[in-house]
Amino acid sequence: MYKVIGATKSRAMRVMWMLEELGQPYEHVPCGPRSDAAKQYNPSGKIPALVDGDEVLTDSVAIMQYLADKHSALTAPAGTPARARQDALTFWLIDEMDAILWAAAKHSFVFPEEQRVPEIKDSLKAEFARSAVNLSDRL
């Protein structure tokens, strides 16, 4: 059985959602980033991590792709043009849109208050709007 390491209100939810979609049982070990529990699975303390037998995998997108490939579901076959297009869109979403959302989160609640720059949010909103148009054009 898989083991998912990470808080529910984190990117660990992506992994748990993927496992639910695949119909795969899993154990959830709730813990926050940089916690002692998280560091047992990833020395940096970043979450999520997935334990599959003796293997520990990290990074939510890599974990989801691993699971899709392992179970031959929810993805195009590796080495096909369809998979290359899927990967291109996935990586673009992570690089462009998720990065903007993460920057907004850091300046809203992740960083200590004295490190937050609230003024950045207007530029992030504008960049997200441009990326949304770009996404619409891609689809």
Feature-to-residue mapping (PLM):
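GST-like domain detector, emphasizing the conserved glutathione-binding G-site
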Residues: 1-119, 126
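Amphipathic alpha-helical packing segments from all-alpha helical-bundle domains
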Residues: 120-138
